[in-house]
Amino acid sequence: MEKAIRNFLSQESAGGILLLVAVALAMLLANSPLSGLYQGFLNTEMQVRFGALDINKPLLLWINDGLMALFFLLIGLEVKRELLEGALSSPSKASLPTFAAIGGMLVPAAIYLFFNFDDPVTKVGWAIPAATDIAFALGIMALLGNRVPVALKVFLLALAIIDDLGVIVIIALFYSTDLSMLSLVIAAIAVTGLVALNRKGVTSLAPYGVLGIILWIAVLKSGVHATLAGVVIAFCIPLRAKDGSSPSEHLEHSLHPWSNFLILPVFAFANAGVPLGNVGFDSILSPVPVGIALGLLLGKPIGVLLFSYAAVKLRLAELPKGIGWHQIAPVAVMCGIGFTMSMFIASLAFEHGGELYGDLARIGILLGSLFAAVIGYFWLSKVLPKAGERI
């Protein structure tokens, strides 16, 4: 198990560096003479027609609705594996990260609403600081190498996965509008087909892919956010075949490099470019960026620690063997790295609220995530044994 986690984390570390490069490049282009070219590229209309089917969207939405559906497919595969065989497969294993994740979503949302509750336009962004960027958080931890106990890595991984599951529920319940019943019926038929394939023990990924594409198109047209199709597909792909092989894990391992080195960097490049020319100091101190930044930087660690501590004291959970609160605390700070997941929710929350709110949200996300990453890294580095010492 340790070897698998180390391989996973080494890949996430490289992906995290690429994410930083993508963000820096996006910010550079958005605030340079090439800004018009950058925005024009993202707004380029792309059309797909097949008979009566017509999908016409700017490139930015193809990235957010299409590429991110593949990312959520990967998240769904990870959630399913951990629920059935991994760190969430029993109540004793799942209890601490579950309580931590719940606190890590509720407190940041409460902090954001404290600053934005009176504004009906901005309060819809309450879920933005509730997210954790699993790839980036694990990537920062991976920079510390073998000094990090495996149990601490598993705790962060399990917490982030439950957090992602919470984000999936939030998107389904709060960011789906103008529902089309015909599209929902087609989506239901596709889901029925996927479930039937699973029940019949079909392990070939091709039929899941065909029905998955139909499901994605139907969900895209239905008003429910299209990325949720990826999660449904993931839950329907069998974890184990009769011969002991795992179609689900095979697909998960195949998707990881695509997610780390293409999907997430492209998403970051498309969404992180904030033009700062019209953003003054007063704007940075406005309720949206302040609520998001404080939600990530303070709300996340407070929520994670408060709910974890309460669960342990009430004997509803226990700390992993060999792990103390002095190690949990900096990991809780790392959970404030919202980054791509927070930007994704921001793109949904302020889709119709105006470009300014979207820009302010991204500034808050970048500030909160950056400080959480730096503080979490140096704090964890300080409390862990030095290289060569026994953990």
Swiss-Prot record:
Membrane topology: Multi-pass membrane protein
Entries under InterPro entries matching the protein: Na/H_antiporter_dom_sf, NhaA
Record-annotated membrane-spanning stretches: 14-34, 59-79, 95-115, 124-144, 154-174, 177-197, 213-233, 261-281, 287-307, 328-348, 363-383
Record's GO cellular component terms: plasma membrane
An individual GO BP term: regulation of pH
Record's keyword terms, sorted: Antiport, Cell inner membrane, Cell membrane, Ion transport, Membrane, Sodium, Sodium transport, Transmembrane, Transmembrane helix, Transport
Catalytic activity: Na(+)(in) + 2 H(+)(out) = Na(+)(out) + 2 H(+)(in)
Pfam families listed in its UniProt record: Na_H_antiport_1
Intracellular or extracellular location(s): Cell inner membrane
Gene Ontology molecular function: any one: sodium:proton antiporter activity
Source organism, top-level taxon: Bacteria
Stated family: Belongs to the NhaA Na(+)/H(+) (TC 2.A.33) antiporter family.
HAMAP family, alphabetized: NhaA
Its job: Na(+)/H(+) antiporter that extrudes sodium in exchange for external protons.
Name under which the protein is recorded: Na(+)/H(+) antiporter NhaA
Organism the protein comes from: Shewanella amazonensis (strain ATCC BAA-1098 / SB2B)
Gene: nhaA
